[in-house]
Amino acid sequence: MLIPKRVKYRRQHRPTRRGVSKGGNRVTFGDYGVQALEPAYITNRQIEAARIAINRHVKRGGKVWINIFPDRPLTQKPLGVRMGSGKGPVEKWIANVKPGRILFEMSYPSEEVALEALRRAGAKLPCKVRIVKKEDQF
């Protein structure tokens, strides 16, 4: 699982989901990528599920890059607890994703296998995504 090794403050404010991605919106490492089309909080479990879906489909010969990291804690109070008495414990770690952000990149010799693997990875994510190619970018 992807979680930070250490953090300065254990609990943070919830990040904003407005706006578009300022950087990280081009395929730089691989040949194909998964691009977010709407804002979302993506948890470390969802990132891991998408990574496993890619690796199971391509078997060998390709390379996968994960361009997001869940560095923000999301807290939640237990069920049935009244309001007050402090902020709840950390429930999960999230990556704040804005529209336009490239989430995963991949290079593989066969184009149709790579696109199918990225399509399966997109099904594991909580937001709408599209598959982009490196040569399609301007």
Swiss-Prot record:
Belongs to the universal ribosomal protein uL16 family. NCBIfam families: rplP_bact. One of its GO terms (cellular component) is cytosolic large ribosomal subunit. This is Large ribosomal subunit protein uL16. One of its GO terms (biological process) is translation. It holds the Pfam family Ribosomal_L16. PROSITE patterns: RIBOSOMAL_L16_1, RIBOSOMAL_L16_2. Keywords: Ribonucleoprotein, Ribosomal protein, RNA-binding, rRNA-binding, tRNA-binding. Gene3D superfamilies: Ribosomal protein L10e/L16 (3.90.1170.10). Binds 23S rRNA and is also seen to make contacts with the A and possibly P site tRNAs. GO terms for molecular function: rRNA binding; structural constituent of ribosome; tRNA binding. The gene is rplP. Part of the 50S ribosomal subunit. The keyword Ribosomal protein applies. InterPro entries: Ribosomal_uL16 (IPR047873), Ribosomal_uL16_bact-type (IPR000114), Ribosomal_uL16_CS (IPR020798), Ribosomal_uL16_dom (IPR016180), Ribosomal_uL16_sf (IPR036920).
